[in-house]
Amino acid sequence: MATELPYDLTPELAPLSWLIGSWEGQGRLGDGSAGTEIFYQRVDFTEHGLPFVEYRAESWLCEADGTLLRPLTVESGFWQVDRARRDGDVGPGMRPADIVPAFRSAEDVEGLRAGDQGFGLTATITHPGSLSELYYGRIKGPQLQLATDAILRGSAAGPYHR
């Protein structure tokens, strides 16, 4: 099925466009075996006219029928096509991007494709309790793979288990 892109979507977000919106579902904590607690998660991907999507996920413990019991956690971050920084990019900090995006067309973005491997992907995710993660991976059509590259742990963070 073809994905219809909004006419005003930043071209660089085309590979991520199918993620934009809300996703939700249930799973099991730990190794996922029977008897482990069930959780519900809602994930939102939002675009703001910049070359990244904002990510936010909220999780709750729940009953098998979906009745929410209590909040588990919240995490947030940013996902983008992995590429070298250009002079016209936003940041660091509040420094605005150039009015003309670094990649102006689908043809420009296609230059970032790694052959049949799709596009490189970077995700930064921050958790409560002074923990941040950096992921690298690939996005190819409606499939993505991510692997943890780096962890930043503050004094309030507990041990990290991949």
Where are these regions (language model features)?
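Soluble ligand-binding/transfer domains with enclosed cavities or grooves
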Residues: 2-7, 13-162
